[in-house]
Amino acid sequence: MLACSMSLLLSFFVNANSQINELKVGVLVQSPEIPSAVPDYLKPNEGEGLAGALQAAKDSNRTGKFLGLGINLNMAQLDDQQALISQAKEWMADGVQILLVDADTQALLALRKALPEELILINTGNREDSLRTETCLANTLHTAASFSMQTDALAQWLRSRRLSEVMLVKGDSESDKKYAEAVKASLKKFGHKLVAEKSWSFDTDLRRVAGKELQAFTQGPEYDLVWVADTRNLFGQLLPYNTFLPRPVVGTHGLEAGEWSQVIEAWGAVQMQNRFFKDNQRPMTARDYNAWIAIRALSEAMTKTRSTQGAELLAAMLHPGFYIAGYKGRKLSFRPWSGQLRQPVPLFNQQALVATAPFEGFLHPRNEMDTLGADRRESRCTLASQE
Amino acid sequence: MYLQSLQKLCLIALLLPGLSWAGQVYVSNEKDDTVSVIDLDSLEVVDTWLVGDRPRGIILSKDQKYLYICASESDTIQILDRATGQIVGELPSGEDPEQFILHPNGDWLYAANEDDALLTVIDIPGRKVITQIDVGLEPEGVGISPDGNTLIVTSETSNMAHWIDTRTNENIHNSLVDARPRDAKFTADGKQLWVSAEIGGTVSVFDANSREEIKKIHFSPKGVHADKVQPVGIRLTENGKYAFVALGPSNHVAIVDQQTLEVLDYLLVGRRVWQITMTPDEKMLFTTNGVSGDVSVIDVDRLKVIKSIKVGRFPWGVAIADE
């Protein structure tokens, strides 16, 4: 009798495994425009973002096979906005319901406009704050942290270290300007003082004269630190140790704030770092992580709902009880108003994890992680009606 | 005269702690590649043994003569002779063994291979691998029923407890639990299975027969943010009275009534408490506190923390021999 019931059970699981119900996901990455002045060692890796999605699909399908659920990925990296749109349309015709997108603001807006609303977008690369506060996109989640999440994390750290007088040095690209705006808002939010603001627009070759040029450039009033806004890696990497006053450098260089770095090893992260390195022969970057966590969130929603319907999955991900484990030591969830992934923001340099925001003492009535980035009252977006 | 020689004997015993056969506690120090030896009477560290890379899981052989140690980064399970503190052999473990458990027959060892999503079944006398079983991603906690017939392995990223029949080594059932399951323990009567979920912040209690969840236990030690309540190690007393649950970075151990499944109290221990083990007489409980690098000792009768003992860097596992 026992043997009989056992074999029945076994066959049940074999059956469940053989019929995999698949969710089709597209992953679109817009090739970044890299100025030739950027040193090679700071250029993005080939396939950044895509590799993270692939890793997550592998991870998730291991769980899924026990439940008869699977994720099927279509991936492309393209330059042109129009090419991105036609690729997305082609995939949609083939049954793709979810699209991960890493693209600039213009391309992201164009994609959302060109594609029907039932196609769910997950932004894995764009940090622009207005996409979370003003320009609210239909059925769109963001796993990339916004600029203000990054700058709030650093501004909290400044408080914890009693540093408050800031010299801001910014580049002249569009994203440098957006980042600098976020810096200024964070300084205000956390009670710091902007004592000087400088724009770096020079195009001299700094490699041999960085000390001389940058020291002269960072002269000015007394400051506790230099905050650099150089999202393209044109000069920021040369600022640490080259400021006129010997002060720390934070921002896009020096002490950075981001979703992920190879220096994160705690909370079980080392296992994923190893897994990723083994498959890709390079460390996992923030753009890989953002794609990874997007797929993991989908997989978790599939496990919860046992569904592969896009709309059901989106509703599940925005449900108040939904959370995912992301090797960050806390539950990650989506802000229901903007679709932004709530997450701790690690602060790190190239060699070590320095701290993790939110810091103790920054309280919030709902969730301490909401002290980072645009809170509900600072946003016009209302993606999900329920809290 | 007699007293004098007794004193001498004691002195010798103190000088040669490795040879003493009093009860001892063994703590694996993940980042020091050592095992700290604590004397059960004096509650002091009496020796530190160098072992393989990144020692984590640590258990005693059935005859209590040997310690088995998962040397995760050496990709092996080391056999350590308790009498000498020397490594006397190795068991094939598969890659990156983290936690393991001994079958009640004393001959079979089940090790979770975290990096490979496998469970390795090892024959100790033959020092060979019997088989490897495909499980979910990042397998971690392993538990075995008192009759030895049912083995549980939890997978941290798949959020599942896999039920394995040890007679066939087949995966017979999968139960979904909350995020990052870490430990699985059967009650002494074999009727219940307890599974902790670190990020979920819960312990799920299953009926071992129907494999249905009976209850999900939540924890809320005073003054601790809910996100920091991260259950890892579970210990169930054999008399069916208490369950102790290590709550990670909340720095507390929860005491749960095994009968009513209600939380009775919380005890403050060292920082980031993960694993717990009880003395065989169930009078003392030892917890490993990874961040503060110490071990807290809890008096089970009085339910009080009576001492903390400094050990190596990142203490992980703990095993106790009563003789």
What are these model-derived regions, one by one?
Chain A
Residues 16-387:
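Extracytosolic ligand-binding ectodomains
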